[in-house]
């Protein structure tokens, strides 16, 4: 409310819920391009004259934007990053980049459950192992949804461990 002269900028998370990543049960939820557009448009027009929007694709609790909203295969990673950036920068609001977005970082590709550090991922894996899920099935969920995807260090170069360290963990 502009008359109250308080907050004039918001971080809205409706877009972050579109695919079910943080729904609590880790089940992917399908969405369509028109649904994505509706959410984005609602915040563009909904704040008209009364506030200012924050524009972002993710943060430390969500998978990497290119892996989540684009295609992170070598063939399409760069195009996906440019598409997401163009969409974000073409909107009204202040863009926020999570560290690594500016160089197109994608989800980490771990090969074992034990490589995940996040407590939410560990609890999910333990629960599903107790239910008899295969490691392959559990890994498919972790590779897509784990918060570890956005919690790896900034990649400095193409060397082993991204030039960040010679130590095996955290990368």
Residue ranges and their predicted role:
Residues 1-171:
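Active-site and adjacent substrate-binding regions of carbohydrate-active enzymes
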């Amino acid at each position: 409310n502009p008359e109250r002269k308080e907050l004039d900028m918001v971080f809205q998370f409706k877009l972050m819920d579109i695919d079910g990543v943080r729904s609590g049960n880790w089940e992917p939820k399908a969405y369509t391009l028109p649904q994505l557009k509706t959410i984005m448009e609602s915040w563009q027009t909904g704040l008209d004259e009364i506030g200012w929007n924050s524009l972002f694709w993710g943060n430390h609790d969500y998978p990497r934007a290119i892996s989540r909203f684009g295609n992170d295969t070598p063939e399409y990673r760069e195009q996906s990053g440019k598409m997401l950036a163009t969409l974000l920068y073409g909107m009204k609001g202040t863009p926020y980049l999570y560290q690594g977005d500016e160089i197109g970082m994608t989800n980490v590709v771990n090969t074992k459950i034990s490589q995940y550090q996040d407590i939410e991922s560990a609890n999910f894996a333990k629960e599903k192992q107790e239910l008899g899920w295969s490691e392959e099935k559990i890994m498919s969920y972790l590779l897509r949804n784990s918060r570890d995807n956005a919690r790896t260090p900034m990649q400095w170069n193409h060397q082993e461990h991204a030039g960040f360290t010679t130590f095996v963990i955290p990368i």
